[in-house]
């Protein structure tokens, strides 16, 4: 007889290697064919809703690791909620208007000026939809479960129609107005930008100190005295209309080389060296308030520059006197308005000077910096010029510097409902908690929102103009345009004449001749995505407003979180979300931003081809995503190793329940051995902890908890000593069926707990466990937390045992290193115990040799009896010796009773009994 044939070795069709790149598409095809998303919605119909509203990614370019991070976090949340008793539909979306798409079309050689706007926009729409299709394929390959056949897309007519309604409602409440004031202007994009479209980068700029000569000192300053200003934008000097000083600061008049100069007293020490005023004497001190309405002369134009009082002039830097150009700065504009100064902005859309700046016509503003500085030097007004590097606003799309430029734009007034916005921020639950402060401060400090853009590809501003120039935004026109867009799309605005866009028979007192014109500007793309609460949440029957969760990158506090809040509070009075969760950015392994120039980009598509989507998803679960996260080949290798451990654990569990039927073979909890109960209690604790952490969106804790359970509780303990039972004992023996009961519970529980994170692998486990044709794991609910008898008492006892077991393992390791034993199965453990440890072992049930995975065990009372060579800890001493007896051919345990049955001379008594009873014919 071959004794190896009597061993009950693991059998499973669940392979050791995942082969994820090839297997995952098969599962995805099956899910699509079986309409799994729809089945999940049907299963959860009638349950409490949990709505995660997808912030739309921009439909341009290949998916990057930031996309993978974002969509996977969302998918984990939605899958968890769908298995936790909620109805949680997921409607993905795309943001499809804006400059990057115009630029992409231009790069293809399309000449925008050589075709109608409507034709150009059609090309933009076609391009955007191809990008949507490409990204949709990528997201589906990542295992993201959602309504991919019916996403929301901002260029679709039904979306645009609802966006028009949002605009109309805001206009109706008086929140929309047209005004001329400085806005961020991008010469590279030839358009106004909102704050959300600005990013700061270091820029080298000329820093100049300029003298303005007093022509009317109002009895405070002598004529010819120089007021000194400092600026890092020399090109704005042609637009200078005044100088601002702080009314509450002290200013000194100093005399140097026969000239008088005025600077803030607090800044004089730093300016003495910088401007060569080392020998200057202070002639007099005046309060800033005394300088109000002093008149100076522009350095090279024949006009006055008025001295004004303003709080924004400080003694933190410069001279305390601020060069003021109302056409090129927000503070400048506001104080200029107060003092009734002209708003001069002598630049065109491309940033080129017009004839309003004599001497600089046709010059690009940045080039003009040098010319202006030279002109100031020529007229003797330049006191100092140097270069500094400072943080400067740039166009987030073109990466080129932006300027402040006063132009006529359409605005949404934030002041009109700022208090409501701030109250709404306070009413939302923010994770991380600092998100509340961040958005609150942004809303508190932000100016009005410039919503018009001078571009072609976007939703038109639905505004008509009467003959007298009056803007027309009425319920009648808004509803008509909304329905026109719903039926024909927004291109109709550019395809039809004004008369065909207005409601039939429309009249207006400002147009006695019945003539009208239409606005040519489009809306800021943030108004597009910011309207999704109306166009998606409110419009779709399966969704609702407010959403339970908005979850995006931390850059969206200034973006989508902000624009969505603004439009929602404006039209509904409340935030569009109950909870907001934000994540950091995906960086390379060294914590650097990924970029083509650094050659450190890692694309999810490539990783999925090499390792599989479940590895990318496990990486997402492993990181503390609320901060910036790192990803590299090395990090993914570490994640793959954890995946391998989880997979091997599943394979072992599946392999050892191949002859187990949970209906007929399971052992009830009360009939289990204590060590088996202990494992079920630990498993139950895991269920509670994992569910709590899913609820708190703490996925990295789940990753560590499950990895720890698989590695420590199962692999290093329970599964390890179980081999001596499940391989060796008779198939139907109580102890074997008890352990299989635990194995079955463990594999079912782990599979369900991991399903939101590893959808493909858990489906594979589930099919192997339950059989082909089974209902998907994703249609199951998460395991419930059970109340298990005596759990506290059993846990306390066995946790204490596990600590002692750790000491035994260390002693065995030491003995192996010292060559006292080979494998631990050749060892005998003698344990010397006192006090609590003695009481513990007296109360424990179990085969301790088996639990320690050695051949023999002896318990001796009294630590003092331990030999010097024993491995000692505070409670026990461990002596390792070679076990006496012979190795049983079947179970490989060293036993003194090997050969007790002469028919089976190489077997121990236990194995001989099993063979005789179950395997001899």
From Swiss-Prot:
- Kindly give the InterPro entries that the UniProt entry links to this protein: aa-tRNA-synth_I_CS, aa-tRNA-synth_Ia, Anticodon_Ile_BEm, Ile-tRNA-ligase, Ile-tRNA-ligase_type1, Ile-tRNA_ligase, M/V/L/I-tRNA-synth_anticd-bd, Rossmann-like_a/b/a_fold
Q: Which CDD domains match?
A: Anticodon_Ia_Ile_BEm, IleRS_core
Q: What is an example of a GO molecular function annotated in this UniProt entry?
A: tRNA binding
As for subcellular location, the record says: Cytoplasm
Where, by residue number, is the motif 'HIGH' region?
A: 57-67
- Give me the residues that bind Zn(2+), please: 888, 891, 908, 911
Motif 'KMSKS' region — list its residue ranges: 593-597
Q: Which HAMAP family match?
A: Ile_tRNA_synth_type1 (MF_02002)
Assembly = Monomer.
* Name of the protein this chain belongs to: Isoleucine--tRNA ligase
* Species per Swiss-Prot/TrEMBL record: Listeria monocytogenes serotype 4b (strain CLIP80459)
Record lineage: Bacteria, Bacillati, Bacillota, Bacilli, Bacillales
């Amino acid at each position: 007889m071959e004794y190896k044939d009597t061993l009950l070795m693991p059998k499973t069709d669940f392979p050791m290697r995942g082969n994820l790149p090839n297997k995952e598409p098969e599962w995805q095809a099956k899910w699509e064919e079986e309409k799994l998303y729809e089945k999940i919605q049907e299963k959860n119909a009638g349950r409490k809703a949990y709505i995660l509203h997808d912030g739309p990614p921009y439909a341009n370019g290949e998916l990057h690791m930031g996309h993978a991070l974002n969509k996977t976090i969302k998918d984990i949340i939605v899958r968890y909620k769908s298995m936790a008793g909620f109805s949680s539909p997921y409607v993905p979306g795309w943001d499809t208007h804006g400059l990057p798409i115009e630029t992409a079309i231009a790069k293809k050689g399309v000449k925008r000026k050589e075709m109608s706007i409507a034709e150009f926009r059609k090309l933009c729409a076609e391009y955007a939809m191809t990008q949507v299709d490409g990204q949709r394929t990528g997201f589906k390959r990542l295992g993201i479960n959602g309504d991919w056949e019916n996403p929301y897309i901002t260029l679709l007519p039904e979306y645009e129609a609802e966006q028009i309604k949002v605009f109309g409602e805001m206009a109706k409440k008086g929140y929309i107005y047209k005004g001329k004031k400085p806005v961020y202007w991008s010469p590279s994009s030839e358009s106004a930008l909102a704050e959300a479209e600005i990013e700061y980068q270091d820029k080298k700029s000329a820093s100049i100190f300029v003298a303005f000569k007093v022509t009317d000192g109002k009895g405070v300053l002598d004529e010819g005295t120089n007021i000194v200003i400092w600026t890092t934008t020399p090109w704005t000097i042609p637009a200078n209309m005044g100088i601002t000083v702080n009314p509450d600061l002290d200013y000194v008049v100093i005399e140097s080389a026969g000239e008088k100069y005025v600077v803030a007293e607090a800044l004089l020490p730093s300016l003495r060296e910088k401007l060569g005023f080392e020998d200057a004497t202070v002639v007099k001190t005046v309060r800033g308030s005394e300088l109000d309405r002093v008149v100076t002369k522009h350095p090279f134009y024949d006009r006055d520059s008025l001295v004004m009082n303003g709080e924004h002039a400080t003694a933190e830097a410069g001279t305390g006197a601020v060069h003021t150009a109302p056409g090129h700065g927000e503070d400048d504009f506001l104080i200029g308005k107060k003092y009734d100064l002209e708003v001069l902005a002598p630049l065109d859309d491309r940033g080129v000077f017009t004839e309003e700046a004599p001497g600089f016509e046709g010059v690009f503003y940045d080039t003009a910096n040098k010319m202006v500085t030279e002109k100031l030097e020529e007229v003797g007004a330049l006191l100092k010029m140097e270069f500094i590097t400072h943080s400067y606003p740039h166009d987030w799309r073109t990466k080129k510097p932006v300027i402040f430029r006063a132009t006529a734009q359409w605005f949404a007034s934030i002041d009109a409902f700022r208090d409501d916005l701030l109250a709404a921020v306070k009413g939302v639950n923010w994770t991380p908690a600092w998100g509340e402060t961040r958005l609150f401060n942004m809303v508190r400090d932000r100016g009005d929102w410039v919503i018009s853009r001078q571009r072609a590809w976007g939703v038109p501003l639905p505004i008509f103009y009467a003959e007298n120039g009056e803007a027309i935004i009425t319920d009648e026109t808004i509803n008509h345009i909304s329905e026109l867009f719903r039926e024909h799309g927004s291109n109709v605005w550019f395809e039809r004449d004004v008369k065909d866009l207005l409601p039939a028979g429309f009249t207006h007192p400002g147009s006695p001749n019945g003539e009208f014109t239409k606005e040519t500007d489009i809306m800021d793309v943030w108004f597009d995505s910011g309207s999704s609460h109306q166009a998606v949440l409110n419009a779709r029957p399966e969704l609702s407003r407010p959403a339970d969760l908005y979850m995006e990158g931390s850059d969206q506090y200034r973006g989508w979180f902000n624009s969505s809040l603004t439009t929602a509070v404006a039209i509904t009075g409340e935030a569009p979300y109950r909870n907001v969760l934000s994540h950091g950015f995906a960086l390379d392994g060294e914590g650097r931003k990924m970029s083509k120039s650094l050659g450190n980009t890692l694309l999810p598509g490539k990783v999925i081809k090499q390792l599989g989507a479940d590895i990318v998803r496990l990486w997402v679960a492993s990181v503390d995503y609320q901060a910036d996260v790192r990803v590299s080949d090395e990090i993914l290798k570490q994640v793959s190793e954890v995946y391998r451990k989880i997979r091997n654990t599943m394979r072992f569990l599946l392999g050892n329940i191949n002859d187990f039927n949970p209906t007929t073979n399971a052992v009830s909890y009360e009939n289990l051995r204590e060590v088996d109960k202990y494992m079920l209690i630990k498993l139950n604790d895991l269920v509670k902890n994992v569910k709590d952490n899913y609820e708190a969106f703490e996925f990295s804790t789940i990753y560590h908890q499950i990895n720890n359970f698989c590695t420590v509780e199962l692999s290093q303990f329970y599964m390890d000593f179980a081999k001596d039972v499940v391989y060796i004992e008779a198939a139907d023996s109580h102890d074997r069926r008890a352990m299989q009961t635990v194995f079955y519970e463990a594999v079912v529980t782990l599979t369900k707990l991991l399903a939101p994170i590893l959808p493909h692998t858990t489906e594979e486990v589930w099919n192997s466990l339950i059989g082909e044709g089974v209902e998907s794991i994703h249609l199951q609910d998460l395991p419930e937390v059970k109340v298990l008898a005596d759990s506290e008492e059993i846990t306390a006892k066995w946790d204490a045992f596990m600590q002692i077991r750790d000491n035994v393992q260390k002693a065995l390791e030491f003995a192996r290193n010292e060559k006292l034993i080979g494998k631990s199965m050749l060892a005998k453990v003698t344990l010397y115990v006192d006090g609590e440890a003695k009481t513990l072992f007296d109360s424990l049930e179990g085969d301790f040799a088996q639990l320690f995975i050695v051949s023999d065990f002896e318990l001796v009372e009294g630590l003092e009896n331990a030999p010097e060579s024993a491995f000692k800890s505070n409670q026990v001493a461990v002596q390792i010796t070679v076990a006496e007896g012979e190795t049983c051919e079947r179970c490989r345990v060293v036993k003194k009773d090997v050969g007790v049955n002469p028919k089976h001379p190489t077997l121990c008594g236990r194995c001989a009994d099993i063979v005789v009873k179950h395997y001899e014919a």
